[in-house]
Amino acid sequence: MEITIEMIKELRERTGAGVMEAKKALEEANGDMEKAVTILREKGVIKAAKKAGRVAKEGIIEAYIHTGDKLGVLVEVNCETDFVARTDEFRKLAKDIALQIAGMNPQYVSKEDVPPEVIEKEKEIYRTQLKNEGKPEHVIEKIIEGKLEKFYEEVCLLEQPFVRNPEIKVKDLITEAISKLGENIVVRRFARFVVGED
């Protein structure tokens, strides 16, 4: 399939990739736009991993108040430079993350933030459920691991499916932004407020 300038332009707009990167990805994907995006994301993950160790001390605090003024979110999203913090792309990312928190009510930023005692309690609940269902002992641990992943998707912001595109997780959204903006990006912390709740 012939790769057109329009296809390259569209892929660049969607991913922030360079001209040659976009062209190569489209060629590799035989012109399939979605496959090309996946190829670039896979390559972008490598770029993002290289940037992950860099210190992110700049950034913004995004505030979101839901219609009706009964629900509000504050989220701190950090990057490496104030230049990136002022970009529309970074501000949109912070806003999307605030909307995610408002809609999906995560309890923690990442898996690493979940206290060990909470994980142990969940494992015990699953273990008891599975024994009561008569599951064989040798498969229980594997099932528990799968259930824990589902638990993380519910309570950890970075593991949640992104509300605007459930095909990707919030961490993938951040990885894409790291690739586009060329800086490490970190969700530092958040708070979600609901009128009448403690």
Swiss-Prot record:
**GO terms for cellular component:** cytoplasm
Tell me what gene encodes this.
Answer: tsf
Q: What is this protein called?
A: Elongation factor Ts
The UniProt annotation puts the region (Involved in Mg(2+) ion dislocation from EF-Tu) at 81-84
Give the record's keywords alphabetically: Cytoplasm, Elongation factor, Protein biosynthesis
Q: Which family does it belong to?
A: Belongs to the EF-Ts family.
* Coiled coil ranges: none
- UniProt cross-references to Pfam families, sorted A to Z: EF_TS
What disulfide bonds does the UniProt entry report for this chain? none
Q: Where is the signal peptide?
A: none
Q: Which PANTHER family does the protein's record reference?
A: ELONGATION FACTOR TS, ELONGATION FACTOR TS, MITOCHONDRIAL
CDD domains recorded for this chain?
A: UBA_EF-Ts (cd14275)
**What molecular functions are annotated in GO for this chain?**
translation elongation factor activity
Q: Does the keyword Cytoplasm apply?
A: yes
Where in or outside the cell it occurs: the entry states: Cytoplasm
The record's function comment reads:
Associates with the EF-Tu.GDP complex and induces the exchange of GDP to GTP. It remains bound to the aminoacyl-tRNA.EF-Tu.GTP complex up to the GTP hydrolysis stage on the ribosome.
Annotated SUPFAM superfamilies: Elongation factor Ts (EF-Ts), dimerisation domain, UBA-like
UniProt cross-references to PROSITE patterns, sorted A to Z: EF_TS_1, EF_TS_2
HAMAP family hit by this protein: EF_Ts
